[in-house]
Design a protein with these regions (language model features):
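Cytosolic regulatory modules rich in charged/polar residues
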Residues: 75, 102-103, 107-126
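The conserved cystathionine-beta-synthase
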Residues: 7-25, 32, 72-90, 97, ...
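Short, charge-rich, low-complexity interaction segments located
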Residues: 53-60, 120
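Short beta-to-alpha loop/turn elements within the nucleotide-binding domains of ABC transporters
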Residues: 12, 41, 60, 77, ...
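Structured interaction and signal-relay segments at domain junctions
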Residues: 48-52
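A glycine-centered beta-loop-beta connector
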Residues: 21-24, 29-45, 86, 94-109
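Bateman (tandem CBS) regulatory domains
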Residues: 1-5, 59-70
Length: 126
């Protein structure tokens, strides 16, 4: 899980958001107005809802392509719960909440790293 997830304002251009994601090395940004989380924009959203539409990426905003509502999971839940929720909802990022407030984000990549680190090897050499 990444604490203090990266955010952008709703009026941020898709081009600017893409550069921000690249610079921060993240696959998602929460769209936030003041203290209110409005939605999430992911690398997949950028491709499917922006680039693939041939719209002007300087004029199209993250508010135009964001996913809302944000799929969230309480911080007390386990990794398997996050895995199951992502599969059930068809998402690759979940907002992680503490008492209902988004405090972090967990991604499929985080799950892969966890499972790689903590699972037993399945193939052995003799």
């Amino acid at each position: 899980m990444r604490k203090n997830p990266k955010t952008v304002a709703p009026g941020t251009s898709v081009r600017s958001a893409a550069k921000h994601m690249r610079d921060e090395r993240v696959g998602s940004l929460f769209v936030k107005k003041g203290s209110l989380f409005l939605g999430i924009v992911t690398d997949t959203d950028l491709v499917r809802r922006a680039v693939a539409t041939s719209k002007d990426l300087n004029k199209l905003t993250v508010e135009d392509i964001m996913t809302t509502p944000i799929a969230t999971i309480e911080s007390t839940r386990g990794v398997q719960d996050a895995h199951d929720m992502m599969g059930d909802l068809g998402v690759r990022h979940l907002g992680v909440t503490v008492a209902g407030t988004i405090m972090g984000v967990i991604s499929v990549r985080d799950l892969l790293v966890y499972y790689q680190r903590y699972s037993e090897p399945k193939i052995t050499q003799d």
